[in-house]
Amino acid sequence: LIADCLRIIGLCRLAYRMASKVHTSTSSVKNKFWSTHVSGMALQYSGDMIGAEKAFLKSQDFACELSLSFSLQHFGKLNVEVGNYKLAEQQFIEALAIREKLKRADLVESTNRAIRGLQKLRT
Protein backbone atom coordinates (compact mmCIF):
# COMPACT_ATOMS: atom_id res chain seq x y z
CA LEU A 1 0.00 0.00 0.00
CA ILE A 2 2.78 2.45 0.87
CA ALA A 3 4.60 1.67 -2.37
CA ASP A 4 1.45 2.36 -4.38
CA CYS A 5 0.96 5.66 -2.53
CA LEU A 6 4.53 6.62 -3.42
CA ARG A 7 3.76 5.83 -7.07
CA ILE A 8 0.63 7.98 -6.95
CA ILE A 9 2.56 11.01 -5.70
CA GLY A 10 5.17 10.57 -8.40
CA LEU A 11 7.95 8.77 -6.53
CA CYS A 12 7.91 5.84 -8.93
CA ARG A 13 11.48 4.63 -8.48
CA LEU A 14 11.14 4.65 -4.70
CA ALA A 15 7.81 2.84 -5.06
CA TYR A 16 9.47 0.22 -7.24
CA ARG A 17 12.31 -0.32 -4.75
CA MET A 18 9.92 -0.65 -1.83
CA ALA A 19 7.62 -3.06 -3.68
CA SER A 20 10.63 -5.14 -4.73
CA LYS A 21 11.77 -5.40 -1.12
CA VAL A 22 8.30 -6.55 -0.07
CA HIS A 23 8.34 -9.16 -2.81
CA THR A 24 11.67 -10.62 -1.73
CA SER A 25 10.86 -10.58 1.99
CA THR A 26 7.34 -12.00 2.06
CA SER A 27 6.15 -15.58 1.92
CA SER A 28 2.53 -14.57 1.31
CA VAL A 29 1.41 -15.31 -2.25
CA LYS A 30 -1.09 -12.45 -2.03
CA ASN A 31 1.67 -10.00 -1.00
CA LYS A 32 3.95 -11.34 -3.74
CA PHE A 33 1.21 -10.63 -6.29
CA TRP A 34 0.49 -7.11 -5.10
CA SER A 35 4.14 -6.13 -4.64
CA THR A 36 4.98 -7.34 -8.15
CA HIS A 37 1.85 -5.71 -9.59
CA VAL A 38 2.70 -2.38 -7.93
CA SER A 39 6.25 -2.73 -9.26
CA GLY A 40 4.76 -3.00 -12.74
CA MET A 41 2.66 0.11 -12.28
CA ALA A 42 5.60 2.06 -10.83
CA LEU A 43 7.81 1.06 -13.74
CA GLN A 44 5.07 1.94 -16.23
CA TYR A 45 4.56 5.39 -14.73
CA SER A 46 8.30 6.00 -14.72
CA GLY A 47 8.45 5.15 -18.44
CA ASP A 48 10.09 1.72 -18.22
CA MET A 49 7.55 -0.17 -20.32
CA ILE A 50 9.74 -3.26 -20.78
CA GLY A 51 10.32 -3.58 -17.04
CA ALA A 52 6.62 -2.98 -16.41
CA GLU A 53 5.66 -5.70 -18.89
CA LYS A 54 7.97 -8.16 -17.14
CA ALA A 55 6.53 -7.25 -13.74
CA PHE A 56 2.92 -7.63 -14.88
CA LEU A 57 3.69 -11.02 -16.39
CA LYS A 58 5.53 -12.11 -13.23
CA SER A 59 2.67 -10.93 -11.01
CA GLN A 60 0.36 -13.34 -12.80
CA ASP A 61 2.39 -16.24 -11.37
CA PHE A 62 1.07 -15.26 -7.92
CA ALA A 63 -2.46 -14.24 -8.90
CA CYS A 64 -5.76 -15.65 -7.80
CA GLU A 65 -8.54 -15.21 -10.33
CA LEU A 66 -9.60 -11.75 -9.15
CA SER A 67 -6.01 -10.53 -8.91
CA LEU A 68 -5.38 -11.83 -12.41
CA SER A 69 -8.14 -9.53 -13.65
CA PHE A 70 -6.30 -6.54 -12.15
CA SER A 71 -3.05 -7.61 -13.75
CA LEU A 72 -4.69 -8.09 -17.13
CA GLN A 73 -6.44 -4.74 -17.04
CA HIS A 74 -3.34 -2.80 -16.01
CA PHE A 75 -1.22 -4.69 -18.53
CA GLY A 76 -3.87 -3.83 -21.12
CA LYS A 77 -3.53 -0.15 -20.25
CA LEU A 78 0.22 -0.43 -20.74
CA ASN A 79 -0.36 -1.98 -24.16
CA VAL A 80 -2.71 0.87 -25.08
CA GLU A 81 0.06 3.32 -24.15
CA VAL A 82 2.58 1.58 -26.41
CA GLY A 83 0.08 1.25 -29.26
CA ASN A 84 -0.44 -2.50 -29.07
CA TYR A 85 -4.22 -2.20 -29.29
CA LYS A 86 -4.94 -5.78 -30.34
CA LEU A 87 -3.18 -7.28 -27.30
CA ALA A 88 -4.73 -4.64 -25.03
CA GLU A 89 -8.19 -5.58 -26.27
CA GLN A 90 -7.51 -9.27 -25.62
CA GLN A 91 -6.34 -8.48 -22.09
CA PHE A 92 -9.37 -6.28 -21.38
CA ILE A 93 -11.73 -8.98 -22.66
CA GLU A 94 -10.05 -11.62 -20.50
CA ALA A 95 -10.23 -9.33 -17.45
CA LEU A 96 -13.89 -8.63 -18.22
CA ALA A 97 -14.73 -12.34 -18.43
CA ILE A 98 -13.17 -12.97 -15.01
CA ARG A 99 -14.96 -10.03 -13.44
CA GLU A 100 -18.31 -11.04 -14.93
CA LYS A 101 -17.81 -14.63 -13.73
CA LEU A 102 -17.08 -13.36 -10.22
CA LYS A 103 -20.10 -11.02 -10.40
CA ARG A 104 -18.03 -7.93 -9.62
CA ALA A 105 -20.25 -5.25 -11.19
CA ASP A 106 -17.99 -2.41 -10.00
CA LEU A 107 -14.99 -3.95 -11.72
CA VAL A 108 -16.99 -4.94 -14.81
CA GLU A 109 -17.84 -1.28 -15.31
CA SER A 110 -14.19 -0.29 -14.94
CA THR A 111 -13.17 -2.77 -17.62
CA ASN A 112 -16.01 -1.69 -19.89
CA ARG A 113 -14.74 1.91 -19.60
CA ALA A 114 -11.27 0.73 -20.62
CA ILE A 115 -12.72 -1.11 -23.63
CA ARG A 116 -14.78 1.95 -24.66
CA GLY A 117 -11.69 4.14 -24.34
CA LEU A 118 -9.73 1.78 -26.56
CA GLN A 119 -12.55 1.79 -29.13
CA LYS A 120 -12.46 5.61 -29.20
CA LEU A 121 -8.72 5.55 -29.80
CA ARG A 122 -9.20 3.22 -32.76
CA THR A 123 -11.72 5.53 -34.48
Roles of regions detected by a PLM:
Residues 19, 23-26, 59, 63, ...:
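Eukaryotic all-alpha helical interaction scaffolds
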